[in-house]
């Protein structure tokens, strides 16, 4: 048991794009920060300035310090934060920080680590990134080299931490060799707030987004980036609508590939069967899950896949790529189907099994909901507290 089980902590969560986009790591950080604060801890976020957040502000009721930044091209709201060591040292002193939690290994993390080491503050590092998230658009010939460079950088980040956190066992198996020998670590799911996603109401969602409610609706939620392989899903649609004209695909999310994906849909003659919703509010995202019939994630790389958990919490059957670098495939167990990575014909076959069979959709949906109970975010927050307390026990 941790030495300080009742101590309320002062925690600095370092996440450069905090509040500036809706990626999984940002959503997870916001949720963890809010729940940690509700449990009595003092939490602050350190992130990058943006057009939306030029000054220090609050996100989910948590104080956020935003610093000078540089945007990452084609990143859809990802900015690199550049506070100075002096600035973070001052903030960490003023906030009496006990633990610095690195959520992303970006520029803000490097500076936060230097400030934390200067003050003797404990560091916990979280694994939220894969080379596939960064280098998939680079020429294939240089991707292995870039991956090795990235791993050496992660070794430096992880080597400065008292302990490491992985969202899944797969993430630990992929990344644990980048940490120090015998370094304490924990597997903590990003989790899901079951109460938040259990509402079956969709309000006027269908009307506002012009989606016909009588159709069988497929749903994708995520960034429109190469590693999400959304083109595979769009290419599967012609075969599906050939047999079921009442099938419709909803795509929630933004990214630099949107125009290319819209053009692909147009070239395939299926524009009327797809709605690109773009970025939506958290409330409308939940409405989208509940308005859908089948959730599809064709991603090539996922260290967990929070959107799959969200779909499961809404009681939806899931269809997921069997990609080697995707932990999301492990969510599929009598609640949906796997399909061969980037094989749009196989994806169409798996989707049609569910489009053709409403009772099977209902069965798989119920199983998804039951399985989602194993990922209650409140248990994840308790585990996160234990990781912090364990880090405080460690020696500098």
Where are these regions (language model features)?
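Aromatic "clamp/platform" in nucleotide-sugar-dependent glycosyltransferases that forms part
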Residues: 300
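A short helix/loop element that forms part of the nucleotide-sugar donor recognition site in Leloir-type
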Residues: 198-211, 217
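Conserved donor-binding/catalytic core segment of Leloir-type glycosyltransferases
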Residues: 212-228, 234-237
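N-terminal subdomain of nucleotide-sugar transferases
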Residues: 1-56, 60-66, 382-385, 389
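Short alpha-helical donor nucleotide-sugar binding micro-motif in glycosyltransferases
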Residues: 92, 158, 279-280, 287-292
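Conserved acidic donor-binding segment of nucleotide-sugar-dependent glycosyltransferases
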Residues: 333, 337-344, 353-359
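Short hydrophobic beta-strand element within catalytic cores of glycosyltransferases
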Residues: 317-322
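Carbohydrate-associated surface elements
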Residues: 49, 170, 191
């Amino acid at each position: 048991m941790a030495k300080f089980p009742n101590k309320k902590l002062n925690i600095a969560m370092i996440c450069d794009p905090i509040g500036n986009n809706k990626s999984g790591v940002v959503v997870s950080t916001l949720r963890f920060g809010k729940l940690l604060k509700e449990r009595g801890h003092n939490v602050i976020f350190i992130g990058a300035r943006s057009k939306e957040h030029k000054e220090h502000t609050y996100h989910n009721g948590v104080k956020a310090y935003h610093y000078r930044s540089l945007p990452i091209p084609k990143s859809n709201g990802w900015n690199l934060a550049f506070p100075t060591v002096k600035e973070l040292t001052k903030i960490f002193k003023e906030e009496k920080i006990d633990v610095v939690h690195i959520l992303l290994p970006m520029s803000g993390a490097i500076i936060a680590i230097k400030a934390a080491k200067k003050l003797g503050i404990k560091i916990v590092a979280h694994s939220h990134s894969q080379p596939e998230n960064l280098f998939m658009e680079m020429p294939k010939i240089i991707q292995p080299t870039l991956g090795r460079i990235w791993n050496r950088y992660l070794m430096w980040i992880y080597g400065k931490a008292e302990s490491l956190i992985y969202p899944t066992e797969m993430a630990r198996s992929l990344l644990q060799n980048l940490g120090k020998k015998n370094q304490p670590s924990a597997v903590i799911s990003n989790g899901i707030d079951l109460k938040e996603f259990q509402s079956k109401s969709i309000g006027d969602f269908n009307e506002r987004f012009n989606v016909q409610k009588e159709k069988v609706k497929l749903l994708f939620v995520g960034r429109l980036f190469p590693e999400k392989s959304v083109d595979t899903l769009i290419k599967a649609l012609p075969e599906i609508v050939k047999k079921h004209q009442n099938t419709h695909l909803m795509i929630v999310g933004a990214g630099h590939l949107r125009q290319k994906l819209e053009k692909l849909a147009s070239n395939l003659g299926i524009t009327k069967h797809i709605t690109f919703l773009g970025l939506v509010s958290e409330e409308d995202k939940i409405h989208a899950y509940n308005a859908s019939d089948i959730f599809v994630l064709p991603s090539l790389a996922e260290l967990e896949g929070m959107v799959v958990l969200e779909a499961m919490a809404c009681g939806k059957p899931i269809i997921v790529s069997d990609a080697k670098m995707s932990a999301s495939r492990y969510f599929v167990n009598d609640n949906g189907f796997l399909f061969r990575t980037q094989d749009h014909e196989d994806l169409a076959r798996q989707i049609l099994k569910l489009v053709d069979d409403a009772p099977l959709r209902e069965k798989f949906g119920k199983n998804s909901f039951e399985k989602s109970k194993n990922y209650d975010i409140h248990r994840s927050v308790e585990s996160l507290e234990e990781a912090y307390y364990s880090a405080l026990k460690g020696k500098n």
